[in-house]
Curated annotation (Swiss-Prot):
<dbReference type="InterPro" id="IPR003695">
    <property type="entry name" value="Ppx_GppA_N"/>
</dbReference>
<dbReference type="Pfam" id="PF02541">
    <property type="entry name" value="Ppx-GppA"/>
</dbReference>
<dbReference type="Pfam" id="PF21447">
    <property type="entry name" value="Ppx-GppA_III"/>
</dbReference>
<dbReference type="GO" id="GO:0015974">
    <property type="term" value="P:guanosine pentaphosphate catabolic process"/>
</dbReference>
<dbReference type="GO" id="GO:0008894">
    <property type="term" value="F:guanosine-5'-triphosphate,3'-diphosphate diphosphatase activity"/>
</dbReference>
<dbReference type="GO" id="GO:0015949">
    <property type="term" value="P:nucleobase-containing small molecule interconversion"/>
</dbReference>
<dbReference type="InterPro" id="IPR050273">
    <property type="entry name" value="GppA/Ppx_hydrolase"/>
</dbReference>
<comment type="function">
    <text>Catalyzes the conversion of pppGpp to ppGpp. Guanosine pentaphosphate (pppGpp) is a cytoplasmic signaling molecule which together with ppGpp controls the 'stringent response', an adaptive process that allows bacteria to respond to amino acid starvation, resulting in the coordinated regulation of numerous cellular activities.</text>
</comment>
<comment type="similarity">
    <text>Belongs to the GppA/Ppx family. GppA subfamily.</text>
</comment>
<dbReference type="InterPro" id="IPR023709">
    <property type="entry name" value="Guo-5TP_3DP_PyrP"/>
</dbReference>
<dbReference type="InterPro" id="IPR048950">
    <property type="entry name" value="Ppx_GppA_C"/>
</dbReference>
<dbReference type="InterPro" id="IPR043129">
    <property type="entry name" value="ATPase_NBD"/>
</dbReference>
<protein>
    <recommendedName>
        <fullName>Guanosine-5'-triphosphate,3'-diphosphate pyrophosphatase</fullName>
        <ecNumber>3.6.1.40</ecNumber>
    </recommendedName>
</protein>
<comment type="pathway">
    <text>Purine metabolism; ppGpp biosynthesis; ppGpp from GTP: step 2/2.</text>
</comment>
<dbReference type="InterPro" id="IPR030673">
    <property type="entry name" value="PyroPPase_GppA_Ppx"/>
</dbReference>
<keyword id="KW-0378">Hydrolase</keyword>
<dbReference type="GO" id="GO:0015970">
    <property type="term" value="P:guanosine tetraphosphate biosynthetic process"/>
</dbReference>
Amino acid sequence: MNSTSLYAAIDLGSNSFHMLVVREAAESIQTLTRIKRKVRLAAGLNNDNHLSAEAMERGWQCLRLFAERLQDIPQPQIRVVATATLRLAVNAGEFIAKAQTILGCPVQVISGEEEARLIYQGVAHTTGGADQRLVVDIGGASTELVTGTGAQTTSLFSLSMGCVTWLERYFSDRNLAQENFDDAEKAARDVLRPVADELRFHGWKVCVGASGTVQALQEIMMAQGMDERITLAKLQQLKQRAIQCGRLEELEIEGLTLERALVFPSGLAILIAIFTELNIQSMTLAGGALREGLVYGMLHLAVDQDIRSRTLRNIQRRFIVDTDQANRVAKLADNFLKQVENAWHIEPISRELLLSACQLHEIGLSVDFKQAPYHAAYLVRHLDLPGYTPAQKKLLATLLLNQTNPVDLSSLHQQNAVPPRVAEQLCRLLRLAILFAGRRRDDLVPEITLRALNENLTLTLPGDWLAHHPLGKELIDQESQWQSYVHWPLDVR
């Protein structure tokens, strides 16, 4: 592989050190290596902001691992940044001098505002959804809050609170008592209050989280079969569960890994304070953050207006998808959706996911015609899809699995991006669109009227269409039968 196409970003965080190595490909990035080590640098800061020798040694030890991988990458294509703990440490110079010797490249201590800007860029390049967003990143010793529209930030704040420093300050006795949480939340709200008005003034349509705490919450919710949206009610529920556990070493929540457990209560307290103070309705996990911001900054790639569209284009190119057919199916599915929207009330994000499934429905053919829906589902489940959340990927894979043949109803109920009933409705529309676009010509798609009454679908075709299309009639009869097996009434006239 040509080393000039390789880029590396290293983030010396207060809780963990991370390294990301990527290859530039098709105006996007392909991840080659991700290494993360819990160094807990912030835990080595004393009251005078002096970093202990033990904490520094943990950091250097980690960098020796990273250094081996960096040898293959040209130095101008490497960026190493240090964040909150090394901004605070009075003896940061000693740590950085040795770090630069180990890595063989410069280490830059970035300001809180620059960190916030880079986090926002990482989110803007990798996360789909509405343009106007609030980004929250809870680090080990600082928390970044950024509002912006598209690629432009409108306000940037880096606050002196993090999951490691709050752990040392409010959970140092390792007790998970109501008082510990109350103190941690109150302190976090006090830190937030001076910046809350400006953040609210700029406003947001979506809120995304880009930190280990949010990642941990996502893993917990997926493991427990909840939908992926983080809400204050879910956070309070998890807090009560933590309080029931009593002590940090006894913290057990389904889906919470041992690695994340130590700083989870402190991160949770900060997040509850953010939700409460800013009146956040819901939050989802960002597709990328600081490291992705560093990489995209080196590549000078413009932020795509629609990240999901770029992702779909790249995948269609890679798997030689017939885009005319994909568009034909999408147009038909959209037409069907408009006809039933008064009865089914399908939300815009669900519509977008249906159209994404239409664009990708034939990728399985690049493996083999036989079992193409299984291949399509497998590919979507395992491909990197910038702009789509893990739950959305799972829904897409499930729709593609059920695009034809008998329906696996349980798989539609196991995804958690949309309610099961909505997943069933999207699946029905996708199947009908694929069926009626089957001859791959616009002029051969009949005029179809679709009506919905609760879960009953009535499909009306031109008067003599069925008589003149015996194969089409056979396929429609088969589809009616398959839908009836899962109690989806389909009446064809």
